[in-house]
Amino acid sequence: DFPNIVLIMTDNQPAEAVGCYGNNEIYTPNLDALAADGVRFNNAYCPNAMCSPSRASVWSGRMPCQHGVHTWLNDKLMDQWPEDWNAIAEFDTLPEILNRNGYATAMIGKYHLGKLDKPQNGIDHWITMSRGHTLDFYGNEMIVNGDTFIHDGHSVDFFSEKAVDYIDGRTNSPDQPFLLMLPYNGPYGHWPAILGPAKNQFWDRYADMPMTSIPREGLNERAIDAFQLAMEWLHQGKEGPNFYSLLQLPNNLTSLRNYYSQVSVIDHGVGQVMNALKENGFDDNTIVIYTADHGFSLGHHGFWGHGQATWPSNAYRIAYNIPLLMWGAGISGKQSSSSFVSSTDIYATLLDRLGLWEDLEKQNIPSRNFTGLLIGDDDNWTDEVFIEQEETRAIRTPAWSYFKRFGGSETYPLKNELYDLINDPDERADLSGQKEHQDKERELSDKIDIFFNTYANPKFDLWN
């Protein structure tokens, strides 16, 4: 039988912002229970540390240089988009493939890949917000299968309630498998959404938390460089990102506590979803996946936010290492895996579980099938992941992290970076350009070139 699939994705959450990844301050009992009974991946990475590109990669199994989404989609430009436009319309997405094969498909949460008023990408049941970014968790305009209204309460609670309603309703069609995409719009991590004390039910737990799980660091000079670049754009009459808050947020204890409380709101919702699956008898034939669109620095390395929060873009672990928990049908539980996987690999792995990957595998798709890892077999797995963030491409292995920078700009000469993760796991001592490491640097650089030469689509390859 085809299993039901629940794919939960959060917005801006590093792996270490979950209790089961070793954080003893954050309250995530439901996620910890999911990890205890399922598989926890310790080295899961996103291909790009921005919302829209990473989501496009999970939905399509492709890298940004293949699907063409390289940064977040700007809500302010939405009126200029063609009717019914979405950024990955030409690709066979996970919900479209499952829909063709008899699945009921639902998307409840943040989309951020195109127009929002109508269902996209093979989705039958469509519930989302009327914007991609979260300015406030309360009072958001919601779209429920074409009906638009303001929801006064917390948006994460709203999406959780609608997910439970959807699961309850599936008992009317028990023989039809379903795919539920549940991309929450939290914890988010930007002002004004996390400015000041939180209004949610978990704030009291964190109001006086010392937040020792977050390092206290001075501002990274590259975060300041990014701010200065944004100011140059503004002086030229261009609209650049608002980096003022990104320089104010590091070490802001109130916002850090607010952020943690939003993670707990999500955890509460995950508990509701798991209870709904069990109460309706779906738990024996359902796969549940919990992950994030990308990681997020909460002041680590002296910057706040994504890979693009510095100039040039960085590829530090904190911005790319994501939680990945899998539980359910066909998965050997109570284990953790240290194998290196990418969120693009979810695509191939789920399709293989359904017997639908063989034909797609012949296409030029970098998504890797990690089914073996779900039953504890890692004998034939290659421990490396590839990352791209516009002017930065990177490879991570258990021993090394290498950032390769675009070399075609005379205005901004960019430096490569090499880190020895065995002796320098926090990526502090850049070894690039040193004679004793030149062979390793050349080896990793060649691997990056081979990977992107293999998979990049010339239409969408920013480096060529």
Regions flagged by a language model, labelled:
Residues 59, 132-149, 246, 271-275, ...:
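Substrate-binding rim/cap in mid-to-C-terminal beta-strand-loop elements of soluble/periplasmic
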Residues 5-11, 98, 110, 143, ...:
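A short aromatic-rich beta-strand->coil structural motif
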Residues 119-122, 127-129, 190-198, 275-332, ...:
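Histidine-centered active-site microenvironments of extracellular/periplasmic hydrolases
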Residues 119, 124-125, 130-133, 296-307, ...:
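C-terminal cap/loop subdomain of S1 sulfatases and analogous C-terminal strand-loop tails that border
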Residues 70-100, 112-260, 409, 413-414:
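Formylglycine-dependent
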Residues 7-10, 14-106, 117, 121, ...:
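Active-site segment of extracytoplasmic enzymes that catalyze sulfate/phosphate-ester chemistry
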Residues 2-16, 33-34, 58, 98, ...:
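Beta-strand elements within well-structured catalytic alpha/beta cores of enzymes
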Residues 1-3, 10, 14-15, 40, ...:
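Long, internal low-complexity/basic segments
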